[in-house]
Amino acid sequence: MAEFVRAQIFGTTFEITSRYSDLQPVGMGAFGLVCSAKDNLTGQNVAVKKIMKPFSTPVLSKRTYRELKLLKHLRHENVISLSDIFISPLEDIYFVTELLGTDLHRLLTSRPLEKQFIQYFLYQILRGLKYVHSAGVVHRDLKPSNILVNENCDLKICDFGLARIQDPQMTGYVSTRYYRAPEIMLTWQKYDVEVDIWSAGCIFAEMLEGKPLFPGKDHVNQFSIITELLGTPPDDVIHTIASENTLRFVQSLPKRVRQPLKDKFTNADPLAIGLLEEMLVFDPRRRIKATDALAHEYLAPYHDPTDEPIALEKFDWSFNDADLPVDTWKIMMYSEILDYHNVDSENQAMEDPLECP
């Protein structure tokens, strides 16, 4: 039986195994508190995320189960990886992952990024998305604070708590507004991997410009700002709008013509503008795919088709439509945790990190 020790962080009790020490708070999310810690077994610094009351409701239990399944399944250099998981005596769940020193949001607010770093960061984001999308997963909440970076410029996408299967009726407001694809605002229904490409395009533009591209005050203002730059959506996109109220709103907007991005990003590499033009397209069916974006001339210094892997198998979403009681989710969670700890250590080894430009 593992020995547990307690620590108070921001008034929250962390009840962790004695394998970890020197807890320091690094972030607070909607569903949990994250601390850095020393892994006394490996000597490495790690991130420990406490999921608050994971078994308090069926919805939260399912969300936690989904995040656990995704963290177990997704194994790629540009996606955050799970190094340990445990349930405390108080029945809180703790995810332990690798610790990276900062995130893209902090980098962008501290100083302008040089061209080679913008290229390298975008390359790694798209490399990670190619893998995630090949697994049948849409991140749905890609934003600078969900993109972690270490001192070697290695980049990893994190926070898959909102991630969903690629196809069914996806509903609601999921991503931070600035990075939200127009089809999420317009249809609230079907959307696919293209929403992540839009978000990556917004992040790319922010790296080029040093500030958010579409800083909407609310979703109406957000959509209006997008049309000021990209013009009025094509009719075939407008016809996909399911809500009559939304349709009336879009049709009430003044007709606008798409502005050349080169006029907005006057100092940017023309190749960067060319790729951005293909990422920020209203019609998701015409938006560039991660695989094609990686092959774009702008990313030629880093592109290597032999080292941009896809998932070995699709993620199993069969649980996702289940409406189960908390006790059933708890049993399933315990089973996943036991399975994780029985996996061969060789399956948990990650490849060598990429080199910094």
UniProtKB/Swiss-Prot annotation:
Gene Ontology biological-process entries: stress-activated MAPK cascade
GO cellular component: cytoplasm; nucleus
Keyword entries, A-Z: Activator, ATP-binding, Cytoplasm, Kinase, Nucleotide-binding, Nucleus, Phosphoprotein, Serine/threonine-protein kinase, Transcription, Transcription regulation, Transferase
Motif (TXY): 171-173
EC number of the protein: 2.7.11.24
Gene3D superfamilies documented for this protein: Phosphorylase Kinase, domain 1 (3.30.200.20), Transferase(Phosphotransferase) domain 1 (1.10.510.10)
Compartments in which it is found: Cytoplasm; Nucleus
Reactions accelerated catalytically: L-seryl-[protein] + ATP = O-phospho-L-seryl-[protein] + ADP + H(+); L-threonyl-[protein] + ATP = O-phospho-L-threonyl-[protein] + ADP + H(+)
Residues that span the membrane, as ranges: none
Sites where the protein binds ATP: V26, G27, M28, G29, A30, F31, G32, L33, V34, K49
Main localization category: cytoplasm
Sequence positions bearing Phosphotyrosine: Y173
PTM comment: Dually phosphorylated on Thr-171 and Tyr-173, which activates the enzyme.
Domain Protein kinase: 20-299
Enzyme class, UniProt record, top EC level: transferase
Residues of the active site: D141 (proton acceptor)
Entry keyword Nucleus: yes
Residues with PTM Phosphothreonine: T171
Ranges in a coiled coil: none
Entry's family note: Belongs to the protein kinase superfamily. Ser/Thr protein kinase family. MAP kinase subfamily. HOG1 sub-subfamily.
Entry comment, domain topic: The TXY motif contains the threonine and tyrosine residues whose phosphorylation activates the MAP kinases.
Protein's job: Proline-directed serine/threonine-protein kinase involved in a signal transduction pathway that is activated by changes in the osmolarity of the extracellular environment. Controls osmotic regulation of transcription of target genes.
Name the record gives this protein: Mitogen-activated protein kinase HOG1
Organism: Blumeria graminis
